[in-house]
Amino acid sequence: MQAVKLLQKVKRISTKITIPSLGEIKDWMLVAYSDAATKKIDHAFSVAGHVIFLVNKRTHAASPITWSSKKIERVVSSSLAAETLGVVKLIGVLYFIKEILKQMYGREQGNIPCLTLIDSKDLHEAVHNVKNSNDKRLLGDILQIKQAIAVDGIIDELRLIPSHEMMADVLTKGGRNGEILLESVRNGKLFIAGGTMIERSKKIEASTWRKLIQAQSEGFDTLEEAGLDAMIDSNKDIK
């Protein structure tokens, strides 16, 4: 019944899609919105959604490359877990896109920076701070996100934005208004919360994350020792 209503709405409302000129490759950036919702399928499984744009950071011209709304196979009980697994899935997609761009334009010119936007404060803090999640099963997933930022360079910045500016919200929650996403597709423009300037967080130090990843690979029962050492080193650098 809901599908019928959606089809009727689609037929009733006329729209258009604008494919703009994206200008010079040196001005390009990838902008990815990632969102998740818990227990939306059969009151058990969560849903992760993302939409990725190729954007000219000078003119704001933008074209969507891909989008997804899929069930998270692992059963989770918290929004932090769902959001974390959603970003982990997104990392694989971003890696694939960046490799294609490198093959098309060369490894140097095709190495386009990537800004990833989330609205989960808990996930943002877990990635940017040296602290453990209460859900020990998430440790490896959060480390994977940290590695994608600090070591692999797949994500250049993980930015926290207000929930009302989350374009992937409509891909994970029924009944949400997708007008801001539709408007961007119609106009071929994307205005990003916080601007197009990508800033690496001062809290993210590659050496810190390498220590955490090394600690996990060496089989620490917990990451407290590695986290404490990394924090001490970071404080020394600041001083």
Q: Which residues make up each language-model segment?
A:
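Amphipathic alpha-helical
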Residues: 1-22
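Short, flexible loop/turn elements at secondary-structure junctions
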Residues: 10, 14, 34-40, 54-56, ...
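A short glycine-rich, hydrophobically flanked beta-strand micro-motif that places a catalytic Asp/Glu
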Residues: 15-23, 30, 98-110
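Generic beta-strand/beta-sheet core signal
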Residues: 20, 33-35, 55, 117-119, ...
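Two-metal-ion RNase H-like nuclease active-site motif
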Residues: 26-43, 119
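Short glycine-rich loop/turn motifs
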Residues: 28-29, 46-52
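A short, polar/acidic, helix/strand-boundary loop motif
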Residues: 52-85
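RNase H-like nuclease module associated with reverse transcription
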Residues: 73-239
